[in-house]
């Protein structure tokens, strides 16, 4: 047996012994009738204590004679005879406990506390003081076991090293990894910040169906489910767009929704089949208004959450404080592939030749607009590090966007890129019911030709447009990718609490 295998076997034996010992301790607690109490009430979290009292000297704390009650998980313990120091972790961070035998009721220190394990959840009451090293601590006069942990924590020095385990057992990741906890706190702040920003601009938050008879609003492969009561196949939504625009038809002129979308596609550092989007629709506005709104949203969130408009992402600094760059799709192709003859992008055969020369397999169902878009994605997208708006998307790849008044082959649409990734997509909405019907027919033809991401024909949505959709602009922003930027995370799994994983066999 190799040394590595021997160490692994020893680790399994040690774990089994640990589990056995902890269960025996729980059995003893059950016999004493003191297991899993639910009557302890704390009055402070660790961050509240640090914020209020870190700046005070020990003499001042003694004079104030402040008694507090805290609760949390025991992360470390140093037993030094008749006294011990404990690190207690709660939602706000960590606080140190000073536990002395003679300051607790008789028997608690030796017969209870010393038999508890790391990972156990404790309740503690006592008075605040500072140690000789200046660390804010609680001198305990009451200590109770609230929850017995039957499994040990990850190694305190190395944390949870197995990346797969971090995602599968997120609870362990959150216990042992400060960075992960902070990531999801920032995520929550971003969601709250978006909602406040939108409400301040007069938008109403709404909810639309997650299960749909016809999936629409994006080019993607849907998940299929079955509604037993209706005996009807349904689809998990790929986007809420068409329902939100129905609401604008109905008179709700500014609406937004933050919720999940589902796309039955590949998994990568940027893609999870279940992801969170914010979509908004604003009547009597165009895509240029959304460009201003998007810039303001990112600038506001950065300032409010991070306290600055410069955000570190990898080895670059993203600047949300200055105006974002704006390029047309063709300008971006030319910028990052200077040898491109712009006239070639107006000719199907020439554009196809360019695409094939850079390794793109051109499908038979693609038209010129799709080919130009694929060229852009291949040669330019990865270079769009600083916040950049790309405009003038071909109508062929924008079946829901309004055609440009001057050039009907392109649409009044933009996509928003940061860090080489698409973060958002917005456009002036197509409100011509007849044009929309024809574009749906074009999508049906593309689907019949083998494009399984082409859209379905949504007759009810066309009917809604026939009742009149005001001039409207719509925007969708990927929340997960936004959180990646704000937390310097480089895989989407790091910002989704429970990402999609293949089951362990």
UniProtKB/Swiss-Prot annotation:
CDD domains: LysRS_core (cd00775), LysRS_N (cd04322). The keyword Magnesium applies. Mg(2+) 2 binds at residue 422. Mg(2+) 1 binds at residues 415, 422. Its EC number is 6.1.1.6. One of its GO terms (biological process) is lysyl-tRNA aminoacylation. It catalyses: tRNA(Lys) + L-lysine + ATP = L-lysyl-tRNA(Lys) + AMP + diphosphate. GO terms for cellular component: cytosol. Binds 3 Mg(2+) ions per subunit. Its cofactor is Mg(2+). One of its GO terms (molecular function) is tRNA binding. Homodimer. This is Lysine--tRNA ligase. The gene is lysS.
